Amino acid sequence: MRCNTGRECPRRLRWWLLALLLSTLSFGCAATSTTILDEEVVTNQKHMASYKSLIIRDFELKSELYTDAPDAKLSDREHRYTQIPSQLAENIERYVKARQIYRDVSRSGQPTATTLVLKGKFTRVGRFRISITGTLHDGASDQEVAFFRQTLWDVLDSTETINLLSREVADFIDRIQYK
């Protein structure tokens, strides 16, 4: 890149610097970023591996989080939001069963002394972010033994998002077995 005239060289240099800046910015940003932020707390005095079964309850999802319309006037997209809690519970059940952490994993049943009960709620549901909080309760005393909070950013496809969240919840359940 040789400059023959005095004015042409700074102009070419500016264009090269601009092109370099734009390429750096485009490579530095991901198309979709599914960053999961989490908080995990285990408060149980008993060893978590002593539990032999897990009951998974549907997470609570209030309609105010995704619509302003009454139930009778929900759009197709808003109607799909009502199915998210059961999809999340089904996926968590599938992932936990695949890891064979517990002898029994179900979505219903009566808790016993060796049962953990997973409960939770959606705290934010939107186009760009889905947040959940969940707790594990001792089956005998209904005392909270563990807590987690997870947020998934840059939500584009709710089906994939629910799959990622359920995998993260199953990972949490697996990790706390050693605490």
Question: Each predicted region: which residue ranges?
Answer:
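A short, hydrophobic beta-strand-centered structural micro-motif
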Residues: L54-D58, S106-R127
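Bacterial N-terminal signal peptides
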Residues: W16-S26
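Short, surface-exposed coil-to-beta transition loops
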Residues: F128-T133
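Short beta-strand->alpha-helix linker/helix-N-cap micro-motif
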Residues: E93-T112
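Bacterial N-terminal signal peptides that target proteins for export
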Residues: C3-L17
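A structural "domain/chain start" motif
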Residues: G28-E90, V145-F147, D174-K179
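Short secondary-structure boundary motifs at beta->alpha junctions and helix caps
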Residues: K73-H79, H137-K179
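Extracytoplasmic/secreted envelope proteins and their assembly/folding machinery
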Residues: P85, A89-E93, G134, I162, ...
